[in-house]
Each structure stands twice: as C-alpha cells, then as structure tokens.
Amino acid sequence: KKVPARELTGLLAKERLETGRIYTMFVDHANEHGSWLDQVDTSNLCLEVNHPLIPINDVNDKDAEIGVCILAALNWLEIKDDEEMESVCDIIVRMLDALIEHQDYFVPAAENFAKKRRSLGVGVSNLAALLAKEGLKYWDTKAPNFVSRWMEKTSYYLIKASVEMAK
C-alpha cells in the first residue's frame, strides 16, 4: 500500500501531539553527522542517544549489542557561572561513566553496548525557571539566542570533560 508522504507525516504529527508516543528519528542525518563508524539504526525513545545495533539471537547472546540509556540532567537554574557549569559537567560525565562499570545489566547485550560504546545522554532541567529568572518567556525573541548560548556552553563543557577523561 502506498501512502502519500504528506498524509503520513500528518498522521505521525497528529499521533505524536495526541499521545506523546511517536518520536521521529532521521537515521540518514544521524549517520551523516554522527560520530559512529557503525551504521546507526535506532535511538532510545527520547532520542538522546543514537544506537548502532548487533542483533540478539538469544537472551544470553554475548556477541550482541542493544542500546541502553545512561542519562542525567543538568539543572540550569542552579548553575551560577561558567566555572560552576564546567565543574558540574565534569562531575556528570565522570559519574555516568562510573555508572557504566558498576551497574547491573539485564542482558549481556546491554552490557556489551554500554561498555563498548560508552554513550552518555545529558539533558537539562529548569529551563522555564531560568528563563523566568532572566525575565524571558519561551516566545520572547531573545529566548532562542539565550537558550542556544547556554546549550553551546553545556555541550562544550560536557565534550571537554569527556575528552579529558579519555586522555
């Protein structure tokens, strides 16, 4: 059966709006711009972490890989300055990396993925409160640039911490 692309996109958007269940991932974009050497086939539900997969043939398959989410959130409202953001980002990266080594995994394929790939997902919380503290609303024209600057700093310090740990 063929479905017109616009109709399908409309149905997906409607379902997402009404249920919150559909997350759209652009696999081609992820493969073109991601850091993986292996092809990315999927992501976790919320799309923080892209996952190359090696399919499971059995629940005890020691050669397979399935993605797991190693996640944390940075509370932007509590960050006082760039020095504190750098410190908190460093702590988050080291904490999540330590978690990879110390947690119990439900199947060997999950442990394989986590320990081989070491994917970390770091989100943010309290964006609305930070905007309010700065006298901004989501729809203010200055809000996107403000959020972009904060996200760039967050990303920079997380990557810096990861690079330092890799050394």
Protein language model regions, located:
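Polar, glycine-rich mid-to-C-terminal structural blocks
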Residues: 1-19, 27
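Function-dense linear segments that define catalytic or interfacial modules
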Residues: 16-114, 124-134
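Short basic-aromatic helix/loop recognition motifs at nucleic-acid
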Residues: 116-118
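Internal maturation/activation junctions in enzymes
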Residues: 89-111, 137-167
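Active-site-proximal structural scaffolding
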Residues: 5-8, 17, 64-69, 89-92, ...
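Short amphipathic alpha-helical segments with coiled-coil-like heptad repeat character
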Residues: 1-2, 135-139
